[in-house]
Amino acid sequence: MSTGLNAGMRLTGNRSRSIEDVPTIVGIDHGFSFPLRYFEVHQLAPDWPTFLEDFQRHWPADAEHTYVDFIRDGAAGNGAARTGNARWRRVTEQRSGSAKSVFHFDVPGSVVKSTHAGIPWLLYLRRQFGARLHFWPFDGWSIPAGMSAVVEVYPSLWKHRFPSHDRTPDQHDAFSVASWLREADRSGQLARFLKPSLTPAERAVAGVEGWILGVA
């Protein structure tokens, strides 16, 4: 499955192709950053690359045999020095209407564990691919022609639009994301969702907190 985008990207389901072979848009279902309040409390510069480095040092979930719960329990890393409050929500989570806080541990439907586990791997990808991979919207709201991109997605926005058939919930989430991206591409709506209607102040905050693709 592949579709051509106006920006020169393609959505592909062929796993034998790398993002360098075919420009690809990759949707990942977890938070890419934290609310601005987190940066303020921990006295961090509002800068996403700096955040990635700092977070990985405290929550090294990319290390071998290291899990989020190990870090929470103090057996690895120093997660206690980089925690947040479940009441803190990013602008995009507030705008979505239903997305939970990236600090809301131990509740159904939360992506907090996958967020804490996944952010160090975003740093890994950034180190591996450098400028060859666009992290939206941190590297800019416009994705350069011919470049692959990684975006944050929230399957709950779209999964009810597609019959689940015999898929597991996780399989249906992945199917729904891929199907929506394909439809949005073919209809010309994807370009609009890559540039949501935000005030200058909201856009500046989202450049630090990140944004869920598809949230208007």
What are these regions (language model features)?
Residues M1-A216:
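RNase H-like (RuvC/DEDD) metal-dependent nuclease/polynucleotide-processing core
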